[in-house]
Amino acid sequence: ALGDLIFVTGAIRDDGTSAAYVEAQYPAIPDFDLLSACRESAVAENIPYHLGICRSHSCLYGDRNPELYSYWARKRAIASDMETAVLFVLGSLRGVRTASILNVVAASQSSVAEDIGKYAAKEAISMSGEEREILTALEAFTRIQK
């Protein structure tokens, strides 16, 4: 649902940038402890969330190729963005803990442009997801420091 959080368990490296740092066979995965802390934080605050794979790509909110989104959805990718794969790859290569918390701002099978327009207009449901992203991340950081 719009405003839910997604904790990315791995990213499909369809972004281009991560390939500049390491071969395509290198996995784009988060730090397990930080990912777990994010999940624990959401559970503690009753924040709706999903765990799953994200497709990172090089196109800003493009919906000109719906078949491509359908293809990856059939492969169980539950989200798409532009940053997660490179974040995970660089974090892993440099020994930095990473996790990716996404806010659902466009629903599957809906108009991406329309849903992004609602987000840009600061509709309450999308903005509440953004606030929950920030709070969850801050709480997760405190959890892994204990």
Question: Which residues make up each language-model segment?
Answer:
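Glycine-rich phosphate- or other oxyanion-binding loops that anchor nucleotides, phosphorylated ligands
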Residues: 1-146
